[in-house]
Amino acid sequence: MKVTKFFGLWILSVLCVLSCTDEEQGTGNIVPNVATAPVKLSLDATPMRGTVSTTRTRGDNSLDLVLGEEAGKTVNTAGTRAGTLTDAQEDAINDICVFQFGNADGKLKYSEYASLTDGQLTANISLASGVGTCTVYVLANVGDLTQKVSYGSALADFKKFAAEVSSGKGTGQNLPMCGYKADFNSEADNASLTVSLTRAVAKVSLNLTTPNAGDAFAVTSVRLMNVAKKLYYVESATTAPTVAELTTYTSDNTKSIAWYVPENKAGSNSLTDWKDRYEDNVPATATYILIEGSYTPKGGIARDVAYTIYLGAGDKAGDFNVVRNTKYTINAAIKGTNMNDGRVLVGKDLSAAGTQTANCYVVNTTDANKWYRFKATIRGNGAETPAQISYTGAVIPANDRIAPTNAALVWETREGDKAPTLDYVGYSRNGYVVFKLGEATEGNAVVAAKNGATTLWSWHIWTTAAFDRNGIKVQTYETRPRNGLASYANITKREFKMMDRNLGSASGTATKVAEEAIKTYGVYFQFGRKDPFPAAGVMTRTNDADIVPVYDA
């Protein structure tokens, strides 16, 4: 076996560059008068933990998951990557860093780097002699990190050794590993040392199955979301990462994908139903697979859809931890768009997953997709509502949540008194109002989220062929505050962008043709109220004017 070795004991934080060949020792970092003794090191890789998959059938119109998500156990710059490795590649060892800590004082006594060039699992290394009982750590496939751990460093600090990574693989495209031998004495153990290594990353595998016969599902994106950036080399993380410490891994959108990722101790809760594993019910930093695409049921219309699959222990719906040296195998059979499964998101999201909510949503009727959704557990844009205008008579705090159980159409216009604005309004288990566009090219509707028969909140839906961000012109206006009055002293000049038409209008063109003029009216609002009323249905009147007809069913 050919082994390239670099020895390092550090007293100063000076970076020394070593240039060595096979079997050549670098001597620039060795502390004088430290005696070493040869030791034969044997390594093995502990298999990744996995479990028997559990099948959870959801029916023909749902997401059927066969989960192999089980808890198991076993930054300086390191690496993590997507792409399946063979078993041999997952076990391969490209290089090692050896760190020797004295048990008496818990300080680093010696470190060494060796490059294993022929794939063998044995190496002739050196350790400091005269140390007595010690603990020897071996890091594999992480490059030479001996320069990162100074001589005399505390073992407690070494155990926190970590790096930010951009994928899950280390040097030589092999997986980062760690192992240790406690209570080792090189002078009493026949100069032989055996260390079992476990991978410092988890493996996430997705196998995607085609839909029911006659249905079609076109995948547009498969991503692994909320992946921890920080890879802990030695010991597991004790806390969940922050939002800033998370990233996203992409894929080639094929039906068989593998990622290697750092562990993520996102936590657990009391969930017992797998259909409740969705955004509002899980830890904010939990890792999940997001599958997006267009689903077309047999004889139906294509709809944008997303499926969210959170990782965690396969036999515990409330577990969301991703742990090192563990396989998470997800066999996902896409079988429909069941809105009673919280992991299924039907329609294009108008509210950016609840981060950009509003009281009015505008959709383009010329888009191929006809299904939309918006978060309905937040009132409007989530702003605080003063008691003076609150429908409850009390202050509604900012981002105060509501808990609907169903949704319904309040009213809608119909183009030519026939073509409906909306074909469907419903409520999904994960807190979204879902609606499908009707045949009307221009229209308005009000939909409500309810708890049984009680309306909790309502929203205006404006559907138009003109809303392509080009068809509706925008004019910028500038305010001119008055001068000389105390009440206007703190008012500054502002700019506002205004559309060329009223909200809900089918046209912005001035005309004297009655039929076309009516299209410019849009909807009416009573001062202080957020929901619109249908506008006039005639251009001229003598007494009372007819309004545009509206329908509630």
Label each residue range with its predicted role.
Residues 1-8:
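Bacterial N-terminal signal peptides that target proteins for export
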Residues 8-17:
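Bacterial N-terminal signal peptides
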Residues 16-43, 206, 325, 330, ...:
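Bacterial Sec-dependent N-terminal signal peptides
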Residues 26-53, 59, 64, 71-78, ...:
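A short, Gly/Thr-enriched small/hydrophobic beta-strand-prone motif that recurs across taxa
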Residues 64-151, 205-324:
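Tryptophan-paired
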Residues 147-156, 305-307, 456-464:
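Edge beta-strands of extracellular beta-sandwich domains
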Residues 159-200, 207-211, 314-352:
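Extracellular beta-sheet/turn segments enriched in Thr/Pro/Gly and aliphatic residues
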Residues 294, 349-553:
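Short, compositionally biased
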